[in-house]
Amino acid sequence: MYFSSFLALGALVQAAAATYFAPNSTGLRIQHGFETILIQPFGYDGFRVRAWPFRPPSGNEISFIYDPPIEGYEDTAHGMSYDTATTGTEPRTLRNGNIILRTTGWGGTTAGYRLSFYRVNDDGSETLLTNEYAPLKSLNPRYYYWPGPGAEFSAEFSFSATPDEQIYGTGTQQDHMINKKGSVIDMVNFNSYIPTPVFMSNKGYAFIWNMPAEGRMEFGTLRTRFTAASTTLVDYVIVAAQPGDYDTLQQRISALTGRAPAPPDFSLGYIQSKLRYENQTEVELLAQNFHDRNIPVSMIVIDYQSWAHQGDWALDPRLWPNVAQMSARVKNLTGAEMMASLWPSVADDSVNYAALQANGLLSATRDGPGTTDSWNGSYIRNYDSTNPSARKFLWSMLKKNYYDKGIKNFWIDQADGGALGEAYENNGQSTYIESIPFTLPNVNYAAGTQLSVGKLYPWAHQQAIEEGFRNATDTKEGSACDHVSLSRSGYIGSQRFCSMIWSGDTTSVWDTLAVQVASGLSAAATGWGWWTVDAGGFEVDSTVWWSGNIDTPEYRELYVRWLAWTTFLPFMRTHGSRTCYFQDAYTCANEPWSYGASNTPIIVSYIHLRYQLGAYLKSIFNQFHLTGRSIMRPLYMDFEKTDPKISQLVSSNSNYTTQQYMFGPRLLVSPVTLPNVTEWPVYLPQTGQNNTKPWTYWWTNETYAGGQVVKVPAPLQHIPVFHLGSREELLSGNVF
């Protein structure tokens, strides 16, 4: 069952290939003592497994996958269906396309029952992908325990692994890694940390832990383990493909979790933002400046505290007296759309607080309605995004106060769930506590507790905006987007929404820039194509004297490098909280002309280059929409089969794989992530092409052979970029 009827989508049945082995069952139900396991063929080359102890599920449990999938065999399982039941005393075999499930006992028929998953190779042989981890003298690989008196339980599910396995995806963490092998990842959202239990393995399978609960992912040497802190059902999916065929794995994942719609054209241009434009006059002067300087801009953003009170979900009329006039003037001067920030928090002095409280539309604490956080001296509670009525209330305010006045794009900041996810200032006290993550497990929602459904909150918040968009434009889910949202968090299948995810409030230093590259590649492997960053980083690092200061040459260099890199991201966006020696507005500047006379032409040249890449961008976004094919592409996606060095480089998380990537099928991007650089080393993979020198350096047109590290000129005005094939084809978008 879906969490909301909004997710209902008829299956788009894809004609199976002649060699496709249709499922030999609609499902197998195993009764194993107090435990029940339901295994169903799911989509192409996949199985869905659900397990529970004692009490059966209701069938209405929260799920992030389509049932039936967007693509799959026509007569496969759905809901809780099955055609075979067993007590677990007999071995069973199910097949779905190129994946096989076998059930086997160990240590005798009373010791347990293990599931094993195999891929059918092109030559007909079978390869073990993984099985339930059950060495001698160990806990059951499906381990349940009850930490409290209620019906919800905790679960730990363990699967076998090998030392040479490589793990890609898992959402985003600030860790310099694209291979997550060896990681322990807590599934708790906070600023710049979006753990999401979707991964691909170099062994030729992908895995989705289809659960809204907080928990943990562990990728050990011999064991992969997933835990759920509080649940009534364990639900996961495994899909198979041939080794190295990551496009097929992404197609399978997106067929289960959702395909991205096509973005509106304006979102692919340059997005201007800072903390913060304080009032209508500043925004109109900004638009006039872009117009007078003849610099293209596609969206201008109004950041937080533009409201009178938290939860008003309206611009403060004292600062923004005529919103419709402002948005029209911005449009007339620049052609740009507008976006405004909103937070999910509601202060008790908000005009909306009484109505939200009276109708049960706010999150609450376990022991009563109490407050869940504070901000700048006000007690606050988040609206309950898991409640459909709360989502409708939020959109009604946004439509009346923004959308109908010309601001039709929304920045859903602080959407991590639980609370704001940060304790900046505790009820107005003088002590400043910076970005301390906490889960607030005492928070309750309509859908459950923070422990049991906490990972749902940001996803449902994205859904609130999507539902509003679709109702306002009378369009169906999956159709092209007219507008966009921008979220600091997400979860399984967030790509189905017209919603960007950005990497959060990062610090303005070189190492943080480097970390963002790896973070974006993990986002891509998770299935999120709509990803971006704050160019220049968001906040000052207090240990680095020049960090974020637009008047220092040290920060200007970092900003130019960072901004150049965003040209080759799914979305090109600048934002940040800057410092300066000379301040002529409410906050320090962050516009293209703010970084010195010598740097302005460089910044503007990259903005123009972004628009020159428009046809290419539309082409790669269209493929992501149609098939789930990744936009940002870690090198293993394209070159693992043709270049034997790639696997070794990825295994060690070498900079040549964490700091460079393919942007679509033709561009190799290697951003400079160190200061004072005049040349930069780049690893050019072997492509398998007959062309002995397939790589062309963008700035010099010099060609290079693959399979080697080359050092190329990289002055401040040039980000290292190579292309395959002709530049003319690339710029025309004729690349597939």
Swiss-Prot record:
Molecular functions (GO terms): alpha-D-xyloside xylohydrolase; carbohydrate binding
EC number(s) reported in the record: 3.2.1.177
SUPFAM superfamilies: (Trans)glycosidases (SSF51445), Galactose mutarotase-like (SSF74650), Glycosyl hydrolase domain (SSF51011)
Glycan-modified residues: 24, 279, 332, 376, 471, 655, 676, 690, 701
Keyword Secreted: yes
First-listed, main subcellular location of the protein, grouped into a coarse class: secreted
Reactions it catalyzes: Hydrolysis of terminal, non-reducing alpha-D-xylose residues with release of alpha-D-xylose
GO biological process, one term: carbohydrate metabolic process
Signal peptide: 1-18
Domain of life of the organism encoding this protein: Eukaryota
Temperature remarks: Optimum temperature is 55 degrees Celsius.
Signal found in the keyword field: yes
Localisation per UniProt entry: Secreted
Cellular component terms per the entry's GO annotation: extracellular region; membrane
Residues at the catalytic site: 413, 505
Role: Catalyzes the liberation of alpha-xylose from the non-reducing terminal glucose of xyloglucan oligosaccharides.
Protein family membership: Belongs to the glycosyl hydrolase 31 family.
Protein name in UniProt: Alpha-xylosidase A
